[in-house]
């Protein structure tokens, strides 16, 4: 990877924001497991705190970390459409920060189809991004 890519990974690990491409738009990302980092997204966008964010993950194996009681049809959708522009709204695990979900009992999960976004998620390793 490039020095800019390595810097983006370091910024995410430090609780900062980065812009990253997906297959549809550029997103503003932060460590979704870090409420202080998530708050920076809301501040940067001027987004109301009760509007949930989408958590980008690098694959199916990260779903159970973020969601519980995932129905069989959701796994079928993941298999058919991930990576890609499909966000699944699932029941969140108890530890998922309310800052991410807007205080809701659900979390939106997505595996982006852009190779740079996927590599950024893989390199981040200690947590997904938003």
Model-derived segments and spans:
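Active-site-adjacent structural elements in enzyme catalytic cores
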Residues: 1-130
């Amino acid at each position: 990877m490039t020095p800019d890519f390595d810097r983006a990974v370091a910024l995410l690990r430090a609780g900062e924001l980065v812009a990253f491409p997906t297959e549809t738009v550029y997103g503003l990302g932060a460590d979704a497991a870090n409420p202080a980092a998530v708050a920076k997204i809301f501040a940067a966008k001027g987004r109301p705190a009760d509007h949930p964010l989408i958590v980008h993950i690098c694959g199916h194996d990260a779903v159970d970390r973020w969601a519980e009681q995932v129905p069989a049809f959701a796994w079928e959708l993941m298999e058919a459409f991930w990576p890609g522009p499909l966000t699944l709204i699932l029941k969140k695990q108890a530890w998922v920060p309310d800052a991410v979900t807007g205080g809701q009992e659900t979390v939106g999960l997505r595996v982006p189809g852009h190779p740079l976004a996927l590599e950024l998620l893989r390199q981040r390793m200690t947590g997904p991004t938003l």
